[in-house]
């Protein structure tokens, strides 16, 4: 496989840059993971939604109010991988977004600021997009932190919200687990472009364009952008204890551009999925808060280019979870790709193409278990921890891997001036 193909499937730049050699899994490390996971105070489950999503509706109480918003996520994550699919590595660091925000009228909101990523022990950072974009500018560096400008404009209608600039990305898209690795919330650059968010009683739709790499005349790298659409159909009465939903999702990445002087040509690859899910919420929630299950079918397709050594493939995924005491989430599932499949932004254990050695396996089956626990101090202040275990089986090879992480989100809002 070419170096281009290998760099493409490396979803997370930081994982490659700060990768470390894997050490054998020991009882001490497993005990440390368990201690960090369960030594937290009671709270509620759905940790990543609390840690990495934001409300995109305009707060009408903030009309004609100038304020400072600070969003911060501090994290320590350790991926103890002894895998043919990917490398083991740790992510110790934080990102912070200080922003100046103003809402001139009820339908318009403006924000401007900076996004800075910092990894403990690093003092200079390569200047390229931190999310699966090749090493085009690896000789250019920033010192101290990886810093980007941050600008967002929102316009809100009755059922539609239009976002330009830095969009509500990452966890906000609510992509299914095999198509999106939640770890990406820690290390990716803020998504930027445009977004349409549509809300009706029986439908939530998120359609976006994330422009990842811009090129100038006769530039030496490719233009790159991702287009996505995530629909959640909500049939029936969603107030009932037992309710169901239909997720339909599409993610396309395109590389090329008429100004491109490279010889790589146009490259377009995609993932698509459709499925169905059930959620049951008992009336007495003292212990059992909710039970959910979901099944999805997925396809991967290479419309043009040669990033993948195959043109397409299919996979399926089933998963179930239970929330206890409104604070503890236990989840498990199984992913299977009978022949070929690559997840553009998912975990490497949900792909048949190895990022470690470039090998393409004829099929993969991954069973996994996930436990998470979080403490919500207030709406904008969340402490969480999680542990994940993966059992993957490929042709002639099987492996067990685990990871754990601890995260703290702090998101204060400070009013500077209010006009009547």
Model-derived regions: residue spans:
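Subset of outer-membrane beta-barrel
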Residues: 97, 101-106, 141-161, 165-170, ...
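Transmembrane beta-strand segments of Gram-negative outer membrane beta-barrel proteins
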Residues: 54-79, 110, 293
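Surface-exposed loop and membrane-interface regions of Gram-negative outer-membrane beta-barrel proteins
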Residues: 34, 108-155, 177-178, 353
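Exposed, low-structure sequence patches enriched in small/polar residues
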Residues: 47-48, 71-73, 93, 150, ...
């Amino acid at each position: 496989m070419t170096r281009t193909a290998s760099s493409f499937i490396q979803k997370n730049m930081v994982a490659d840059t700060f990768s470390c050699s894997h050490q054998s899994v020991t009882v001490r490390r497993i005990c440390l993971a368990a201690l960090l996971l369960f030594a937290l105070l009671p709270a509620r489950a759905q940790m990543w939604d609390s840690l990495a999503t934001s409300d995109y509706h305009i707060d009408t109480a903030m009309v004609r109010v100038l304020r400072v918003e600070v969003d911060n996520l501090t994290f320590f994550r350790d991926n103890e991988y002894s895998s043919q699919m990917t490398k083991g590595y740790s992510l110790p660091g934080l990102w912070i977004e200080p922003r100046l925000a103003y809402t001139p009228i009820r339908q318009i909101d403006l924000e401007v600021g900076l996004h800075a990523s910092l990894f403990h022990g690093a003092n200079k950072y390569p200047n390229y997009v931190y999310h699966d974009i090749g090493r085009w500018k690896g000789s250019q560096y920033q010192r101290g932190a990886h810093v980007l400008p941050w600008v967002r404009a929102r316009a809100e209608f009755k059922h539609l919200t239009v976002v330009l600039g830095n969009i509500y990305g990452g966890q906000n898209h609510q992509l299914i687990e095999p198509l999106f690795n939640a770890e990406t919330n820690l290390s990716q650059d803020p998504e930027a472009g445009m977004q349409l968010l549509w809300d009706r009683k029986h439908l939530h739709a998120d359609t976006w364009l994330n422009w990842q790499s811009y090129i100038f005349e006769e530039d030496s790298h490719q233009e790159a952008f991702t287009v996505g659409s995530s629909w959640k159909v909500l049939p029936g009465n969603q107030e009932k204890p037992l309710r169901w939903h239909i997720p339909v999702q599409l993610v396309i990445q395109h590389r090329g551009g008429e100004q491109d002087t490279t010889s790589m040509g146009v490259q377009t690859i995609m993932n698509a999925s459709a499925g169905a899910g059930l959620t049951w919420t008992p009336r007495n929630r003292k212990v059992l808060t909710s039970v959910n299950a979901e099944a999805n079918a997925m396809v991967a397709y290479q419309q043009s280019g040669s990033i993948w050594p195959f043109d397409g493939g299919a996979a399926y995924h089933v998963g179930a979870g239970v929330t206890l005491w409104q604070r503890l989430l236990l989840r498990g599932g199984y992913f299977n790709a009978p022949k070929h499949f690559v997840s553009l932004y998912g975990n490497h254990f949900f792909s048949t193409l190895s990022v470690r050695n470039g090998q393409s396996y004829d099929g993969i089956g991954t069973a996994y278990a996930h436990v998470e626990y979080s403490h919500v101090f207030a709406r904008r202040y969340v402490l969480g921890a999680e542990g994940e275990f993966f059992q993957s089986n490929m042709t002639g090879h099987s492996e067990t891997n685990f990871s754990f992480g601890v995260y703290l989100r702090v998101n204060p809002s400070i009013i500077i001036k209010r006009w009547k």
